[in-house]
């Protein structure tokens, strides 16, 4: 196995490689004088970027110092010779890898291909040149400095060396007059050359000016090449017009999309409503078919209890057809039993079909009012009074209304006051018992009862207090003897409301039973 390169050879090689203009800046960030190198890619890096490469791992980038490390191998040196910042930049740019992030850049397909290429070129150069320090394109680099004898000061500054002209002139053309002129100047005497003191040093001056002029573009390219794209760009009026037009087009497109979405939502809603209407119509036809299949008595019972959909009365409507008002005529007997305040009640509450959970059962008692209007049910004589005609002008506020009891009491008190005036007109003093007639009547009745029972051997409480009807049991008890007329009216109203509530509850129970067990 061949021995590794010596420290002097390593320093000489890197001194030459770092003298190349493209290798004088960091490959990643462009910092000046990089002193670290990535052997995997053959590029030169600054100390900060070398730390980033170390964090990527040795499988992606292997880092060494060009000044501190002395254990370089010949394969590593060949990789640095065949690589370089210029070659790496051209390869990455050619394969479209322009990312600045190190993790993205060196994990890309272009980085993988360049790693393989550098490894192959380094192995080929090592196999061809062995342990030679320079390869073909660098053989003449260290041999350009022969021993200098006594050189003339003017000759050094008027004639450029061959490697400078080759490096600065890319076309490789040289002026042929310079060698002949230099040889003719060196032949007469070895003393100092005084040709520059003459009147025509035009050729040499033109050469010097051309050399200086050719170095300026290279220097400008190195320092400012990466900052040309950061300048400001002038915006014309035409660009503003184009931007405004694009914004208007985008706004119109957005409005059209919103309108289309709204239209689609409406169409879907209409379709769902139509489907619901069709389902309702199918359910109604099924109920009608079930009702038609029932026999006579069962069908009558179902219609009477409100179980069928066909026998609905009063005001109703269907969602499957147009709105139609179906009014029911109220019987005369029901009209006569309503009071003045019944004008504000809802008509036909029980006739609108089966009750719902949201219905109020406390406002549904007036439907059965016609059942309690007969006189035989109460065992009393009904005083029929002609109800006055109710008009808008006759309706009074609640605060101004007087109940029937107050009106009766006011009439009775008026009669009693007139009779009392006539009876006690000449009396000087009267008592409350005398005014109301309690004292005389009670004493007379007590005396008469005692006289009647004076000869009997046993008496009962009914005989003592005169309860003849209770003792014989032949009479009938009526509410007229217990309650006044106004209280009877209120009592009847309460019974009507209770009966209505019971009817609503019974109807709801029957409907729930039909819904639960009707399909079996």
Swiss-Prot record:
GO process terms (BP): COPI coating of Golgi vesicle; protein transport
Segments forming domain Arf-GAP: 11-127
Residue numbers carrying N-acetylalanine: 2
Protein name per UniProt: ADP-ribosylation factor GTPase-activating protein 2
Description of how the protein assembles with itself and partners: Interacts with the coatomer complex. Interacts with the C-terminal appendage domain of COPG1.
Annotated GO CC locations: Golgi membrane
Region (Required for interaction with coatomer): 97-520
Pfam families, per database record: ArfGap
Bias kind Polar residues: ranges: 168-186
Coiled-coil region: 241-307
Gene Ontology MF annotations: GTPase activator activity; zinc ion binding
Modification Phosphoserine occurs at: 140, 145, 200, 236, 239, 311, 333, 339, 363, 431-432, 512
Principal subcellular localization: cytoplasm
Key words, A-Z: Acetylation, Coiled coil, Cytoplasm, ER-Golgi transport, Golgi apparatus, GTPase activation, Membrane, Metal-binding, Phosphoprotein, Protein transport, Transport, Zinc, Zinc-finger
Protein's job: GTPase-activating protein (GAP) for ADP ribosylation factor 1 (ARF1). May regulate coatomer-mediated protein transport from the Golgi complex to the endoplasmic reticulum. Hydrolysis of ARF1-bound GTP may lead to dissociation of coatomer from Golgi-derived membranes to allow fusion with target membranes.
């Amino acid at each position: 196995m061949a021995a590794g390169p010596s420290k002097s050879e390593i320093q000489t090689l890197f001194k030459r490689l770092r003298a190349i203009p493209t290798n004088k800046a960091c490959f990643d960030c462009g910092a000046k004088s990089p002193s670290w190198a990535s052997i995997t890619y053959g590029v030169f890096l600054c100390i900060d970027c070398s730390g980033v490469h170390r964090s990527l791992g040795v499988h992606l980038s292997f880092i060494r110092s060009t000044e501190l490390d002395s254990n370089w191998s010949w394969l590593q040196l060949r990789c640095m010779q065949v690589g370089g910042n210029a070659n790496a930049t051209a390869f990455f740019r050619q394969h479209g890898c322009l990312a600045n992030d190190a993790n993205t850049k060196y994990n890309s397909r272009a980085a993988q291909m360049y790693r393989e290429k550098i490894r192959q070129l380094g192995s080929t150069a090592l196999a061809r040149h062995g342990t030679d320090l320079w390869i073909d394109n660098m053989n003449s680099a260290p041999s350009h400095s022969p021993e200098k004898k006594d050189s003339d000061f003017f000759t050094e500054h008027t004639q450029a060396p061959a490697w400078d002209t080759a490096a600065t002139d890319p076309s490789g053309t040289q002026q042929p007059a310079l060698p002949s002129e230099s040889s003719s100047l060196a032949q007469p005497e070895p003393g100092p050359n005084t040709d520059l003191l003459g009147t025509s040093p035009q050729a040499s001056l033109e050469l010097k000016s051309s050399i200086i002029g050719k170095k300026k573009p290279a220097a400008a390219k190195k320092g400012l090449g990466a900052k040309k794209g950061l300048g400001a760009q002038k915006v014309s009026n035409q660009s503003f017009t184009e931007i405004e037009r694009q914004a208007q087009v985008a706004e119109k497109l957005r409005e059209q999309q919103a309108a289309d979405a709204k239209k689609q939502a409406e169409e879907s809603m209409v379709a769902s409503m139509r489907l619901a209407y069709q389902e309702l119509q199918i359910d109604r036809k099924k109920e009608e078919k079930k009702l038609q299949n029932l026999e006579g008595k069962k069908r009558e019972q179902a219609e009477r209890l409100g179980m069928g959909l066909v026998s609905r009365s009063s005001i109703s409507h269907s969602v499957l057809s147009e709105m139609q008002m179906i009014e029911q005529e109220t019987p005369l007997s029901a009209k006569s039993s309503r009071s003045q305040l019944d004008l504000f009640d809802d008509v036909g509450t029980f006739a609108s079909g089966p009750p719902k959970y949201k219905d109020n059962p406390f406002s549904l008692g007036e439907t059965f009012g016609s059942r309690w209007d007969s006189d035989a049910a109460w065992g009393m004589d009904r005083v029929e009074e002609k109800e006055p005609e109710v008009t808008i002008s006759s309706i009074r506020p609640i605060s101004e209304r007087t109940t029937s009891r107050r009106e009766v009491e006011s009439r009775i008190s008026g009669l009693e006051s007139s009779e009392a005036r006539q009876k006690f007109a000449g009396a000087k003093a009267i008592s409350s018992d005398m005014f109301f007639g309690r004292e005389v009547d009670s004493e007379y009745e007590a005396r008469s009862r005692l006289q009647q029972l004076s000869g009997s051997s046993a008496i009962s409480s009914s005989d003592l207090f005169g309860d003849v009807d209770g003792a014989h049991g032949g009479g009938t008890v009526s509410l007229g003897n217990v309650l006044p007329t106004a209280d009877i009216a209120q009592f009847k109203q309460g019974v009507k409301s209770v009966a209505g509530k019971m009817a609503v509850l019974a109807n709801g129970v029957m409907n729930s039973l039909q819904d639960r067990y009707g399909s079996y």
